[in-house]
Amino acid sequence: MDEVRIGIIGVGQIGKNHLKRYVDIPGLRVVAAADLDEAELTRVADEYGIEHRYSDFRKLLERDDIVAVDVCLHNNLHAPVTIAAINADKHVYCEKPIAGSYRDALSMVEAARSSNKMLHIQLATLYTMETKTAKHLIDSGAVGRLYHGRSTGFRRRGRPFVDGYGTANFVKKKVAAGGALFDMGVYHIAQMLYLLGVPNIERVSGKIYQELAMDPERRASSGYDVEEFATGFVRCTDGLTVDIIEAWAVNLNQFEGSSVMGSEGGIRLDPFELSKLHVADIGRRAVEAIRAAYDAREQELGADRMRALERFL
């Protein structure tokens, strides 16, 4: 296989995470990186042996030896940088969420389609052991007729910056576009829509909240203006319904895991239990399907992100 040469735009927290995965993919080489922070760019590029470094991502896009770029920037920058990359004749792998608004997301998709370029959004939950097994069970008819899905995940205290981790850029609308729903919710919603067969949406309602106390100094210094809690209800044209609960902070114990309800059985997924799929009332077929799907590589922490990258490549 010919060597695939790519560039990475943004070497912050997410960019470093992606670079760690790239070194394990044979036939791939990161030849260029771009970031406004030149000191950090130099440090990261030296660590990963990236020869070409740019403070202006447009210079990176001028390289004709790069076939694809990985966009690892703040949410509201995804659209302009992705579209610029597509216009520069590059395929794009972009960190989630796709964009800060539906309008921007649609512009990205239209640019990719009109240019016949691949646009892949990092949604690692679509590649987990739980998702693959659940999809197998659903497609086999083991759970019967689907009628409801639950997309949920919340932390007792896990607000970026104000609760002690991450930067303030996660909690500023002008940079991140949204809070828990954009940061965590996209993973669970994408997973649920996939399991339900990507149904046509009829109506969506929802509400966002910012109710819990936080350190006043951190609130002031961060400019915190996004939601910590979001809830929604989705009606589909075929009668399916989905409820959504996402929270960075809530006065309940931490919990994460979506569920699917059918006329013959139900499936609950919990990624923090390392590929233990909870299945109720499905019987022998379900047990056999789960056992058949298990593989040592699937159990590795971060394997879902690796599969997402490999899928793009």
Where are the model-predicted features located?
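Acidic-histidine catalytic/liganding microenvironments
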Residues: 25, 48, 63-64, 128, ...
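Beta-loop-alpha module in the N-terminal Rossmann-like domain of NAD(P)-dependent dehydrogenases
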Residues: 18, 48-111
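N-terminal Rossmann-like dinucleotide-binding module
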Residues: 1-48
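C-terminal helical cap and adjacent loop that interface with cofactors, partners, or active-site loops
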Residues: 254, 258-261, 268, 283-313
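Hydrophobic residues in well-ordered beta-strands that form the structural core
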Residues: 54, 94, 119-121, 244, ...
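Contiguous beta-strand/loop segments that form the cofactor/metal-binding neighborhood of enzyme cores
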Residues: 190-281
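Predominantly a Rossmann-like dinucleotide-binding segment in NAD(P)-dependent oxidoreductases
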Residues: 118, 125-224
